[in-house]
Design a protein with these regions (language model features):
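A short, well-ordered alpha-helix in the C-terminal region of glycosyltransferases
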Residues: 157-172
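C-terminal alpha-helical cap of glycosyltransferases
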Residues: 171-185
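C-terminal "capping" alpha-helix adjacent to the active site of nucleotide-linked donor transferases
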Residues: 128, 132-157
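Short hydrophobic beta-strand element within catalytic cores of glycosyltransferases
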Residues: 88, 104-115
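Donor-nucleotide binding loops and adjacent catalytic segments primarily
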Residues: 3-88, 119-122, 134-143
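Acidic, glycine-centered active-site loop in nucleotide-sugar glycosyltransferases
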Residues: 102, 119-131
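Short, acidic/turn-prone active-site loops that include or flank metal/cofactor-
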Residues: 72, 92, 110-114, 138
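Acidic donor-binding loop of glycosyltransferase active sites
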Residues: 81-96, 103-104
């Protein structure tokens, strides 16, 4: 039986999404955390006004990882298909897209989102063993390093189950379900 581990002896592709505007806090914290993990190919969507600042931070914390910084991704579905792991916020659309792509998500909810809805979006997938949830606080950098190191120790089969759970959590044909509910009234 193949017991190969994820993130070992292969280049792991990580997609970082901070939303269409980017996330200054993720842009500052994630390059430092990812410095501690080797053999990564990172594509980081930083937001239109954050490119230079994000590039400087990656240069400051450079290691052997390949990094591509992108202001905005027009064809986001191609990036979802490319990634092994997606590190992102937990807005409803982003969580749905990660699930629909069957990707493994590490969700970092926006801490000041109304009614903490991003936390609950991410918690739903975490509770289904379909993703990881990290809270944005003073420990975020260390928590992310720990999760990525923990992922290194998990068997590929278990990670594949998490990806499958993520895809199963995606609500298929939501417009039909909404229509049916309205029509039933």
């Amino acid at each position: 039986k193949n017991k190969n581990k994820f993130l070992q002896s292969i280049e792991t592709k990580i997609l970082i999404l901070g939303g269409s505007q980017g996330s200054k806090s993720l842009n500052l914290i994630l390059p430092k955390a990812l410095l501690n993990i080797e053999d990564l190919f990172i594509k980081h969507q930083c937001g239109k006004n954050n490119f230079e600042e994000t590039e400087i931070i990656y240069q400051q914390y450079a290691n052997n990882n390949k990094v591509e910084i992108i202001e905005y991704m027009d064809n986001i579905h191609e990036y979802y298909g490319w990634a092994d792991i997606i590190i992102c916020r937990a807005g409803a659309l982003t969580v749905s897209e990660v699930s629909a792509s069957g990707s493994l998500g590490i969700f970092i909810p926006l801490p000041w989102a109304i009614d903490n809805h991003q936390f609950f979006n991410a918690k739903h997938l975490k509770d289904l063993n379909a993703g990881f949830l990290l809270e944005e606080n003073d420990n975020l950098e260390q928590d992310l390093i720990k999760i990525l190191n923990d992922i290194k120790k998990i068997e590929i089969e278990k990670l594949q189950i998490m990806k499958e759970n993520s895809y199963k959590a995606y609500i298929k044909n939501p417009e039909k379900k909404i229509y049916d509910e309205i029509a039933a009234i």
